[in-house]
């Protein structure tokens, strides 16, 4: 009889622990619309060209440094964008891939995860030789969330200006979202 009581209590405690762990590992779903405007200057660049079927292609690896402005601290502050572009100089069309790294100013009080910051992978298309439209997918920290958003930018010489999740330069909607959790 005593042995059955011990097994019952052990099973009950084990069940409470299991339920507690399950509740702790799955945060409630959350979403937040976000946006950021940014400008950056090219600090490093390497290009090469090749010709194929009468078209000249320019392949460029570049690093851009600047600032991002956002009401969301994880997207604002110092910004480093690294890109690889392949541009058909004959037609002005091409594609790009790269990374976005933003970090809030040092004056921001670090939370549990440190200073608010975000990292994302970028990919998209180039139109008219200097207009970029693409997608940013990544994560933000302090607090943690996933990042998914549309990106639009214009390159003028060694400067890039654009927006992540804003209504311009392309209307009506160029959304970005921070999200986490599940049901």
Predicted regions and their residues:
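Bacterial N-terminal signal peptides that target proteins for export
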Residues: 2-10
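Bacterial N-terminal signal peptides
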Residues: 10-19
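Beta-strand-enriched cores of mature, soluble protein domains
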Residues: 25-183
């Amino acid at each position: 009889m005593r042995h059955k009581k011990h097994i019952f209590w052990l099973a009950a405690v084990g069940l409470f622990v299991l339920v507690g762990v399950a509740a702790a590992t799955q945060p409630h779903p959350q979403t937040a619309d976000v946006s950021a405007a940014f400008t950056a200057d090219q600090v490093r660049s390497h290009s090469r060209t090749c010709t194929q079927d009468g078209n000249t292609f320019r392949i460029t690896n570049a690093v851009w440094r600047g600032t991002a402005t956002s009401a969301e601290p994880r997207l604002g502050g110092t910004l480093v964008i690294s890109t690889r572009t392949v541009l058909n100089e004959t037609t002005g069309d091409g594609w790009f891939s790269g990374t976005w790294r933003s970090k809030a100013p040092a004056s921001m009080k670090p939370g549990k995860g440190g200073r608010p910051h975000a990292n994302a992978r970028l990919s998209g298309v180039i139109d008219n030789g200097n207009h970029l439209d693409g997608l940013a997918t990544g994560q933000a920290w302090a607090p943690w969330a996933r990042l998914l958003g549309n990106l639009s930018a214009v390159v003028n010489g060694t400067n890039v200006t654009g927006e992540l999740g804003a209504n311009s330069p392309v209307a009506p909607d160029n959304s970005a979202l921070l999200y986490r959790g599940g049901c």
